[in-house]
Amino acid sequence: MLKTLNRRSWTCRQCIRILRRNAETRRYFQGASAASPLCQHTVSSSTSDKARDDQTLRLIFDSEPFWREFSQPKSSTSKRTGLLQNQYLTGPDGFLQFAQVSLQKCQKIVAKVIAASTLEDYRGMVRDLDRLSDLLCRVIDMAEFMKLNHPSPQIQDAATQAYALMFEYMNVLNTTPELDAQLKRASADLNVTSHWSPEEKVAARVLLKDFSQSAIHLPPKDRQKFVALSNEISQLGPMFVTNRQPETDHVTVDKNKLRGMDPSLIQQLQRWRKVAVPMFGDIPRIALYSVHDEETRKEIYVTSRTSSKVQIRRLETLLQKRAELAKLAGFPSYAHMTLSDKMAKTPEAVVNFLEALNASNRGQVQDELSQLLALKQADVPSATQLQPWDHAYYVHQYSARHSRVRRSRESTLLPAFFSIGTVIQGLSRLFTRLYGIRLVPTETLPGEIWNPDVRRLDVVDESDRRLAVIYCDLFTRPYKSPNPTHFTLRGSREISQAEIAECADLSSSLHPNDGMATTIKPETNKLYQLPTVALICDFDQSESRSTPSLLNEHNLETLFHEMGHAVHSVLARTDLQTISGTRCATDFVELPSVIMENFATAPEVLALYARHWETNEPLPEHMVKSMELNRQSRVSMHGGMDNEVQILMALLDQAYHSSRPLEPNFDSTRIYHDVYSTHSSLPDPPGSRTSWQGYFAHLVGYGATYYSYLFDRAIANKVWSDVFKGGELSTNRDAGERFKNEVLRWGGGRDGWNCVAGLLGNNPANDNGKLAEGGEEAMREVGRWGLGLMGTSEL
């Protein structure tokens, strides 16, 4: 998952994740060296040093004694650096200072852009606005990250204040039409645009699109209404997410009706001979897969999928406000407004994709349901069809009867081969083979990290030049979010000579990247801020920490997924921050992370790293085969239905963000039943008036874009099959370079369809390069590719 900021962002449309950093650091077992803050950092390229780095990478995560020694300062300096080596963030007061200094720089840039009149001014305008975007992101992203992840309440409060100051200023920019007018003037002048680089032209289009979506072109009265609607929407969203509740809190049934359910759980819920089954939390799910009595399952199913009327009103108000906002901005619907800068472009194209995908998935669904119906008929010979409240129950029954591998001793031994250190080591080895980069464990300076458990990894290339910095905060702790997330802390960007001079004029101690990581590109001799990212996970540790943290298969794929986002940030080292790293179309950004899930368990990749944490023995071949058979068994029994559930949610999302919310008798429940009765293999019974949509929290964060994850899964399935040959080329350098050069290195600087077309080349699916144009037929073609055996977890 990428962290998405819920803010309008003409400057950082895809500030879709959060944050950044620098200053020279020292390596383990090496003394500190006095390095210029602007000099390029390199590490030793000797074979022995690389082997030591590889071993150290594993040990800093797996060995607590080794980590304690490694993380001890190797010099006597008592001076503390700032968080992420940001020179302002040495304490809570530094957040406001950082925001104020950045704000002053922003104001100067805005004044310069508004006053622009010469060709030289207009030719430099995109870079000026990109720097404005970067200055805003530096503060907002950093503050948002620390607000969510720093354990100190004082730091959290200070970060909140800094965030509020810059967010308020961003709202001022969103009501400054002169910026939009000046950029339009520059973009319309061939004497200007002929001097722009391809990146500058893309960034200009992105910025103009963001201006249009903030309704900056509207008359003042309409613009005020747009801001008011936006504020209402921003308040309704969290209210909808945090108030999901059923219309009826409990279903009361006789104890004997719950046979099959865990007796200890029944006892907790029992009152005399009756049991009050709550309709929230995990209990309904547990009941649906374990209770033998069909009528009881039906009652629990229907009741648990019926939202409170208040919650439905909240949703309908939210959808109506979004539709009004889009209409005010000149779009037919909220979906049209949201999708205009995505690969899909239109809601019609999204529906084409989803219907084609549903058709390609239907055969598997019917096979699954036929097997489950046979199980039901063994229990109830007169049964002629499977009901929606039967599905979980008979999947569970099938698993209990057939999935011996799951219950075998062998499956319980698998995590011992996937310690976190072993997996990180494997990721580094994989990246070396695919992209010629590796992860180097690096000592942090006092004050640099927000928690003692955070590890810093530098990413270096084959010339041992540093490319990026990754902070790994992977272990659970009190009050930490359980959601795995990739945060962009600072994106790639060229730092101009003017910025360097500006810092020197202000103070000899100031750094043009606030003290965070920089490098000099040898090809151009220009200074760049390095991509800096954080990976947040919530993996358990043993209480004594005497044994390493071991990952099950789900957590293994999660770590590979998040590292897929990270490598996208690392390799998309653009000149402009606006299009750096993961700042690309929402329906393209998950491709690198989704495809990484396939690498996690590919036999060729497992051979690189899967070793027992204690004996160092490689994962036996028969266990590799068992993993694959178990995965195929899961997918063959409910993978198709899992896919259909996601497809239906995406179709419902499109229906809700059409123009229908503006109709006088808009009824979200009727639309829900229309969509499901048309497309579902197991629709809710007619007349049930279930209203599951009240639980659909992703409507808030992914309004009109819920299809994106499915879309990227379909593309990833095709790429894995055709480029990486289903895993045969999963460690092949040519295949890796192809993926890097056609997809990863561009960030948001190349249209996603061109990336896909370039990647597939002469593949029949891309006959005559037809995918490069995108459009409704291209969306339908991707739907035909299907989802394969890839992960089926939702967003």
UniProtKB/Swiss-Prot annotation:
EC number in record: 3.4.24.59
Classification via InterPro entries: M3A_MIP, MetalloPept_cat_dom_sf, Neurolysin/TOP_dom2, Pept_M3A_M3B, Pept_M3A_M3B_dom
Positions with a binding annotation for Zn(2+): H561, H565, H568
GO molecular function: metal ion binding; metalloendopeptidase activity
Annotated GO CC locations: mitochondrial matrix
Keywords, in A-Z order: Hydrolase, Metal-binding, Metalloprotease, Mitochondrion, Protease, Transit peptide, Zinc
Broad class of enzyme this protein falls into: hydrolase
Active-site residues from the entry: E562
Domain of life: Eukaryota
Compartmental location: Mitochondrion matrix
Record-level GO BP terms: peptide metabolic process; protein processing involved in protein targeting to mitochondrion
Principal subcellular localization: mitochondrion
Catalytically driven reaction(s): Release of an N-terminal octapeptide as second stage of processing of some proteins imported into the mitochondrion
Entry keyword Protease: yes
One of the Pfam families matching this protein, by short name: Peptidase_M3
Keyword Transmembrane in record: no
Transit peptide: 1-22
Cofactor binding note from Swiss-Prot or TrEMBL: Binds 1 zinc ion.
Cofactor(s) needed: Zn(2+)
Function statement: Cleaves proteins, imported into the mitochondrion, to their mature size. While most mitochondrial precursor proteins are processed to the mature form in one step by mitochondrial processing peptidase (MPP), the sequential cleavage by MIP of an octapeptide after initial processing by MPP is a required step for a subgroup of nuclear-encoded precursor proteins destined for the matrix or the inner membrane.
Similarity-based family: Belongs to the peptidase M3 family.
PANTHER family in the record: MITOCHONDRIAL INTERMEDIATE PEPTIDASE, PROTEASE M3 THIMET OLIGOPEPTIDASE-RELATED
Protein name: Mitochondrial intermediate peptidase
